[in-house]
């Protein structure tokens, strides 16, 4: 949000969106500390997210001959979002699996249990496309299941989100979203996009190079606040280095104006001060419905004057209320 009733979409995350568990944990903490507030105000519930996620995944399953066996596929305990993988699997009452827990048997994905082999019908995967299957994608992957993609292509397993959905995460594709909405739906977007210059285009690159100190530069495939430049808060040497990157690899970058994100008060060791925030809502889509959570993850930049709200960059989170 940049001003009252003025919201912008900063980016889309369709591949492995994370943060829903922290949304729920934030709510649990607030309810424990301030139960009287939830008694006084009719704050909408967020605890139903895992149940809605499970129902959405099952609704996407196309084989109706049996009740599907669902599991969560995680890169492992060293992944920064492992807590969430474990949390969601536990809340849904399904197995949390790594690639080493699985085998390919008769062109199906199978888990060995004390009761024998179980076929997995749906994998809610929390692994990036490149690492899903070393036989199909990155051969150096140590966290993917060899042969998984062949099973997927044969229709014997459902992967969610589907491989390839990450194209919508692409920051260059983001710049076309208003046109995509107009083309496919013949509608105008309800929420605005941030103006974006594609550095792959000659005139855009020229403008960006002449205005680096005013702009935010992002890697097209970047995430987590890495590989970006925030011009107004960067040193001359940092801007110089980024200029060289842009000139040598313009296709890898987009640029946007520096957005004045809204602020919320936070408690620091020196008192209460404003810090910049953004909101990450969660949407679940199945063939016949879309459900948007009654809340979301409000991410906050804990450092003074910082616009980086990513947890990987030292950001924090806040409980988000929707009041009925």
Residue ranges and their predicted role:
Residues 1-324:
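Domain-scale recognition of functional cores that engage charged ligands
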């Amino acid at each position: 949000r940049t001003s009252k009733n003025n919201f912008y979409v900063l980016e889309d995350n369709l591949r492995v969106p994370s943060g829903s568990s922290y949304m729920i944990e934030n709510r649990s903490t607030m309810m424990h500390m301030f139960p009287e507030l939830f008694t006084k105000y009719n704050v909408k519930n967020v605890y139903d997210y895992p149940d809605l996620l499970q129902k959405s995944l099952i609704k996407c399953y196309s084989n109706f001959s049996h009740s599907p066996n669902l599991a969560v596929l995680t890169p492992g305990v060293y992944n920064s979002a492992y807590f969430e993988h474990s949390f969601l699997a536990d809340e849904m009452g399904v197995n949390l699996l790594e690639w080493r827990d699985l085998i390919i048997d008769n062109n199906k994905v199978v888990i060995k249990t004390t009761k024998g082999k179980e076929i997995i019908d749906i994998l809610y995967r929390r692994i990036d496309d490149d690492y899903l299957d070393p036989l199909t994608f990155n051969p150096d992957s140590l966290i993917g299941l060899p042969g998984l993609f062949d099973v997927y292509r044969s229709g014997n397993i459902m992967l969610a989100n589907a491989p390839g959905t990450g194209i919508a995460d692409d920051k260059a594709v983001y710049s076309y979203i208003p046109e995509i909405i107009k083309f496919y739906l013949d509608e105008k977007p309800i929420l605005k996009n941030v103006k974006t210059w594609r550095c792959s285009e000659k005139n855009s690159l020229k403008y960006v190079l002449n205005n680096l100190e005013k702009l935010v530069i992002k890697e097209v495939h970047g995430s987590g606040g890495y590989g970006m430049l925030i011009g107004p808060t960067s040193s001359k040497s940092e801007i110089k280095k980024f200029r060289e990157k842009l000139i040598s690899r313009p296709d890898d970058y987009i640029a946007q104006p520096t957005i004045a994100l809204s602020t919320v008060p936070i408690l620091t060791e020196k008192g209460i001060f404003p810090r910049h925030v953004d909101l990450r809502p969660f949407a679940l889509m199945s063939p016949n419905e879309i459900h948007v959570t009654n809340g979301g993850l409000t991410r906050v930049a804990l450092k003074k004057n910082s616009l980086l709200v990513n947890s990987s960059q030292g950001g924090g989170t806040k409980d988000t209320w929707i009041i009925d």
